Amino acid sequence: IEFSEMIEPLIQEETFFIVSSKSFSTDETLQSIELSKEWSGMKCDFDKHFIAITSQPKKAQIFGFSDKNIIQFPNEIGGRYSMWSPISLPAILELGEQFIEFLIGGSLADTQFLNDRKYQEFLKTLSFSDIWYNNFLQKGTRVLLTYSWKMRFFTDYAQQLEMESIGKQPNKDSIFQKTGQVVFGGFGSTAQHSYFQL
C-alpha cells in the first residue's frame, strides 16, 4: 500500500531508484526492488533507472545491478543513518550545498573531540555512566527527549546507532554483559506527557 501511494504521482521514464541496503538481504528491501522493477516494466532501461548502495555488491548483482551501478561501502559501516557514507546519497541529492555544510559541522565535531581534553573527559564520563547504570544498577532503559524542533528525530538516530551497534553480542569474557540500554524518547514537549509519567 505504501509503495503504491509513493509511486502514484511518478512517471516511470522520469523516476530514478536508489536502493540502499547494507546486506542486500532484508525482505522489505528485496520486495521493494521487485515492486519497483515490476512498476517500471518495459518502459525503463534498468541500468539507467536503478543504482544500489551496499556493502555486498555480489548480492546486488544477483538482482540485476551491473558493476557500474553499484556503490560499495565497507562492511564495518552501519547500514542506516550512515551520514558519512554513500548511504547518504539521497540526502546529498536533496540538500546539495547544505549537505556540505553538514559535513563541515561533522568535521568540526571530530576536531573538537581530538583536540579538546575536557570534551573527551565529558564523553568518557557519559559513556561510563551508561555502562554503570546498565550493568551495576540494572537500569536497562533510557529516555532521550529533545526540545528543539530541529532535533525532533535525534531519538530515532540514537536508537538505531546505539541499539543496533552497541547491542551486538558482547565479549563472553567481559564483566560488562549488557552493552547498551533500550532507548526511548521523542520530541520533548509531546513525549514528556507519556515518559515522564512512569
Predicted regions and their residues:
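Glycine-rich oxoanion-binding loops at beta->alpha junctions
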Residues: 1-14
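Extended, hydrophobic alpha-helical segments in both membrane/secreted and soluble proteins
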Residues: 3, 19-22, 26-40, 50-52, ...
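A generic alpha-helix structural signal
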Residues: 7, 33, 103-106
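Glycine-rich, anion-gripping cofactor-binding loops and their flanking helix/strand elements
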Residues: 8, 23, 193-196
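Local beta-strand N-terminus motif with an aromatic residue
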Residues: 14-15, 162
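Generic beta-sheet signal
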Residues: 15-17, 142
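Short acidic, glycine/Ser/Thr-rich loop/turn "cap" segments at secondary-structure junctions
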Residues: 17-21, 71-72
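Active-site phosphate/pyrophosphate-binding segments
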Residues: 39-198
